[in-house]
Amino acid sequence: MAAADLSHGHYLSGDPVCLHEEKTPAGRIVADCLTDCYQDSVTFDDVAVDFTQEEWTLLDSTQRSLYSDVMLENYKNLATVGGQIIKPSLISWLEQEESRTVQGGVLQGWEMRLETQWSILQQDFLRGQTSIGIQLEGKHNGRELCDCEQCGEVFSEHSCLKTHVRTQSTGNTHDCNQYGKDFLTLCEKTSTGEKLSEFNQSEKIFSLTPNIVYQRTSTQEKSFECSHCGKSFINESYLQAHMRTHNGEKLYEWRNYGPGFIDSTSLSVLIETLNAKKPYKCKECGKGYRYPAYLSIHMRTHTGEKPYECKECGKAFNYSNSFQIHGRTHTGEKPYVCKECGKAFTQYSGLSMHVRSHSGDKPYECKECGKSFLTSSRLIQHIRTHTGEKPFVCVECGKAFAVSSNLSGHLRTHTEEKACECKICGKVFGYPSCLNNHMRTHSAQKPYTCKECGKAFNYSTHLKIHMRIHTGEKPYECKQCGKAFSHSSSFQIHERTHTGEKPYECKECGKAFTCSSSFRIHEKTHTEEKPYKCQQCGKAYSHPRSLRRHEQIH
């Protein structure tokens, strides 16, 4: 089901809302949810977390503050990589949280009765959004835009324009009988994306409804100034939050993968609150969903149903968005363009990752060795070098891989097609690039040279590993005994001494080994193969170490 079919819920209302359950809960909250592999045309609605009125009342002030931070960061991510988009009223309202203090005692004893306010915000939000990079000229989602002839402000609703014009001509505001304050209508501000809590000290005019009243401190009272851009804030915590926009620090932890980001506890609490009600359970795996439609989509993972088939190549997909993205491989369409270098991408996730290459932002850090990565998927792959996990197993030969793409390439070696076969040794590869890398082993070409000792290598990765000999770096440490290793393979073999695992078993005699090299040496004892011959006397050995010991005699 396309995301667009599920996007019309209210933030705070009595009506049911849609939370896009086909995505992970954390992905609906953190800004990195924008790289969802099923994402197509991204709007703020796609990355906004929706609440029912009942759910909102369950959140305490800390969780509501966290919600504000999340929504603002999501919007900034969209604005960074997208074209022109009209600022949602929700964002305009939330932005003022950074420069707003609660007027003394006004909120005490008040209930957060926001039905009317949020309903207006949501209506305006639904009308005012277009997809990233698409600005409808003169219209919003098919609706005519209305602009004020006196001041030039633009409105998405004619009724809002009328209210705005009436306020300009009469100066009418809405008076709060309880506190004697004057209020501008919410509509005239929300349609333009203006800040909702702008406060005039002399006239005491607010642009929020009387349900909740905030006073904005004057500029003179903002003593905490940003050294980067000069923006001022009323307290140090607001300044620290703002500084994250400059240094690229991320507020939230992607719970499944665990990079060391702050505020993970608060995020987990919010996630659990969002997932409190999931009555529709999958009988196969027990996973729960809020709505039966989401459960139906999930069931495709068990049934293998792929209802969306490409007419060009016959490839089928579980999800409509995946099908649409695939279609671009045939049309050549690349709608997501980098503003820095002009490089274009078929889907938003590619652009999102590419943008980080310009900023140098690598938010996913390995807790074992400190290495950072652009994406969470790269971090997961890297973590497997520490754990030795290889979850992708070939059903033909049993060979296991840490990365699914490597398994895909390997599977081609079992097919009749041998387009990537080495003509020298007959070895078959899944991809031409793998064959090209392999060919270096037959040639004398070793383009990567160590500046310390002059040793040359076929591959840059081999040079990096070699450099650890000079630097003494040993990033792979055993948690059992504390022993450290410079190579991940050595670390994995060492761990087997603790677990007792011996995966390499001889079919001739049943003897098992912890590493493949020992196994290969042992196999030669059955074949009596002795490929390592002494050039001095002609004596042959099955292993190079035996030959080296023998050569010392000469």
UniProtKB/Swiss-Prot annotation:
* Gene3D superfamilies listed in its UniProt record: 6.10.140.140, Classic Zinc Finger
Gene Ontology BP term (one): regulation of transcription by RNA polymerase II
Q: Which InterPro entries match?
A: KRAB, KRAB_dom_sf, Znf_C2H2_sf, Znf_C2H2_type
Residues in C2H2-type zinc fingers: 146-174, 224-246, 280-302, 308-330, 336-358, 364-386, 392-414, 420-442, 448-470, 476-498, 504-526, 532-554
Where is this gene product found?
A: Nucleus
Q: What does this protein do?
A: May be involved in transcriptional regulation.
Q: Which keywords annotate this record?
A: DNA-binding, Metal-binding, Nucleus, Repeat, Transcription, Transcription regulation, Zinc, Zinc-finger
| The protein's name in its UniProt record | Zinc finger protein 426
- What residue range is the signal peptide? none
Q: Any one cellular component term from GO for this entry?
A: nucleus
Which molecular function terms from Gene Ontology are attached?
Answer: DNA-binding transcription factor activity, RNA polymerase II-specific; RNA polymerase II cis-regulatory region sequence-specific DNA binding; zinc ion binding
SMART domains according to UniProt: KRAB, ZnF_BED, ZnF_C2H2
Organism of origin: Homo sapiens (Human)
Q: Where is the KRAB domain?
A: 42-112
